[in-house]
Curated annotation (Swiss-Prot):
Gene Ontology cellular-component annotations: membrane
Pathway(s): Amine and polyamine biosynthesis; betaine biosynthesis via choline pathway; betaine aldehyde from choline (cytochrome c reductase route): step 1/1
Gene3D superfamilies: FAD/NAD(P)-binding domain, Glucose Oxidase, domain 3
Cofactor(s) recorded in Swiss-Prot or TrEMBL: FAD
Family membership: Belongs to the GMC oxidoreductase family.
Active site: H473
Keyword Transferase: no
Protein name as annotated: Oxygen-dependent choline dehydrogenase
Statement: the UniProt record of this protein carries the keyword DNA-binding: no
Class of enzymatic activity (EC top level): oxidoreductase
Species: Citrobacter koseri (strain ATCC BAA-895 / CDC 4225-83 / SGSC4696)
InterPro entries: BetA, FAD/NAD-bd_sf, GMC_OxRdtase, GMC_OxRdtase_N, GMC_OxRtase_C
Example GO biological process: glycine betaine biosynthetic process from choline
Length: 558
């Protein structure tokens, strides 16, 4: 089998590449996916409110676990990644958050990455998006990703939480992806007008899968990339439970889009990585690249949970006797409780003047429950998810064997610096100040978690060690750049070899301020033009907010 391009991983970036490359009818593409189809009849991946379900099994989730995390009481922590057409866009929380303009401007300060500035990238965010209230300078109107905005008649807790953030002295913003990210405001979501999850399988592959020049193979677990000398020439994979590899050859390039955990793992198994690690597993060295699998970053977050005095939370929706009606309303009308991810309000703030752009993110949820659907509080409640955005902690992903079915050793090294601890203490204390504002007076009951007895630095630190969880945003393990730990150049080409690119969240040099999915899709769009040899889209002329000397906050109301 010969193809022009072989794409490994039909996820948030891989599906973008498969769709854009096959727009050229004389270009043939093979798309390999280790998981299965995105079964449209399975409400678990299609109903936005069911977002906790795909995380609970292994049909759609790789369900990786970390090594014992040394600063987190040696807990083995969850590291869920999407498996199946759509990748992590099939199982994520559907928050459409792009990050801060300064994140990209920060990447672009590195020599060779100047074309990754915010204004260079904004046209690609717009190209990917169709926003339900129409396009403007920041948003698209005819892209493959459906974005839904919160409506005025949604849960009153969303409005109260935004007001409370403003009353606490922080800015208000009407669009967290627009002119100004900093502040509290409504949060967009990747949901279609019919109330379905807008994964990249739905948005991109649906328009491409009928093309004769695109071949999609599911249940195809990539073993390794084939090389002729230093030139990537093809891919070997295992289908289903088979132990006999299948292979295909690439006339032009192999495009690795397996994500921040699997992409470095595949490179290492293929002979590209740190020579000493590969030698330990008798893997023939193709190219010594010490940065492969290093620079691992993530967002850590925790929940502050409160009793709700008014019966307006989502608690009734968790009762089995209410669920048939909710399901029917969603299935037949695409409306109701089932049609939202319920992260419809949030915010970004600076916890101190030391930060030039926000370092803390909030998601608000009008129910008290764990992200994966466990430990629901048996009463009306609400919660704030809060966490730091650009932790200095760095981890790694290392293979444990040559077996593609064995998970790698993953260590995030969470909370390994003093900055991490200070940010989380500040975040908890600021959250309590926000919750104490007048806007929440009629709703706010007792603090369920961590509880008002948790006050000192030592008590807060112990709570974080015991209860903080991943926000499921791993990145950075094949970083872009030109220093000795960089893995790819500014076009995603792997240093030291030919005809091989990495295009996914692993190439982010530094994690962004917010959820990763929208930016991973943008990376796919931008790289697709580079691979096709097309002129980049014209740089945007939109203005954007830079805090400069603006104070972190105004005096709070209370």
């Amino acid at each position: 089998m010969h193809f022009d391009y072989i794409i490994i991983g039909a996820g948030s970036a891989g599906n973008v590449l498969a769709t854009r490359l096959t727009e050229d009818s004389d270009t043939t593409v093979l798309l390999l996916e280790a998981g299965g189809p995105d079964y449209r009849a399975d409400f678990r991946t299609q109903m936005p409110a069911a977002l906790a379900f795909p995380l609970q099994g292994k049909r759609y989730n790789w369900a990786y676990e970390t090594e014992p995390e040394p600063h987190m009481n040696y807990r083995r922590m969850e590291c869920g990644r999407g498996k199946g057409l759509g990748g992590s866009s099939l199982i994520n929380g559907m928050c459409y958050i792009r990050g801060n303009a300064m994140d990209l401007d920060n990447w672009a300060q590195e020599p060779g990455l100047e074309h990754w500035s915010y204004l260079n990238c904004l046209p690609y965010y717009r190209k990917a998006e169709t926003r339900d209230i129409g396009p403007n300078d920041y948003h698209g109107g005819d892209g493959p990703v459906s974005v839904a905005t919160p409506k005025h008649n949604n849960n009153p807790l969303f409005h109260a939480m935004i007001e409370a953030g403003v009353q606490a002295g922080y800015p208000r913003t009407d669009d967290l992806n627009g002119y100004q990210q900093e502040g509290f405001g409504p949060m967009d979501r990747t949901v279609t007008p019919q109330g379905r999850r807008a994964s990249t399988a739905r948005g991109y592959l649906d328009q491409a899968k009928g093309r004769p020049n695109l071949t999609i193979i599911t249940h195809a677990l990539t073993d390794h990339i084939l090389f002729e000398g230093k030139k990537a020439s093809g891919v070997e994979w295992l289908e289903g439970d088979s132990t006999i590899p299948t292979r295909a050859m690439a006339r032009k390039e192999v495009l690795l889009c397996a994500g921040a955990i699997a992409s470095p793992q595949i490179l290492q198994r293929s002979g590209v990585g740190d020579a000493s690690l590969l030698k330990a597993f008798d893997i023939p060295l193709v190219h010594h690249l010490p940065g492969v699998g290093e620079n691992l970053q993530d967002h850590l977050e925790m929940y502050l949970q409160y009793e709700c005095k008014e019966p307006v939370s989502l608690y009734p929706a968790l009762q089995w006797w209410n669920q048939p009606k909710i399901g029917a309303e969603w299935l037949f009308g695409g409306t109701g409780v089932g049609a939202s991810n319920h992260f419809e309000a949030g915010g970004f703030i600076r916890s101190s003047e030391a930060f030039s752009w926000p370092n803390i993110q909030y998601h608000f949820l009008p129910v008290a429950i764990n992200y994966n659907g466990s430990n629901a509080v048996k009463e009306h409640g609400f919660q704030c998810h809060v966490g730091s955005m650009r932790s200095p902690s760095r981890g790694h992903v290392h293979i444990k064997s040559r077996d593609p079915r064995e998970h790698p050793a993953i260590l995030f090294n969470y909370m390994s610096t003093g900055q991490d601890w200070q940010e989380f203490r500040d975040a908890i204390r600021i959250t309590r100040e926000i919750i104490n504002q007048p806007a929440l007076d009629k709703y706010r009951g007792r603090e369920i978690s961590p509880g008002i007895t948790c006050q000192t630095d030592e008590q807060l630190d112990a709570f974080v060690r015991d209860h903080a969880e991943t926000a499921f945003h791993p990145c950075g393990t094949c970083k872009m750049g030109y220093d000795e730990m960089a893995v790819v150049d500014g076009e995603g080409r792997v240093h030291g070899v030919e005809n091989l690119r990495v295009v996914d969240a692993s190439i982010m040099p530094q994690i962004i301020t917010g959820n990763l999915n929208a930016t991973t899709i943008m990376i796919g769009e931008k790289m697709a033009d580079a691979i096709r040899g097309r002129e980049p889209l014209a740089k945007s002329t939109a203005s954007y907010y830079v805090a400069g000397d603006a104070p972190v906050r105004q005096p709070p109301l209370r």
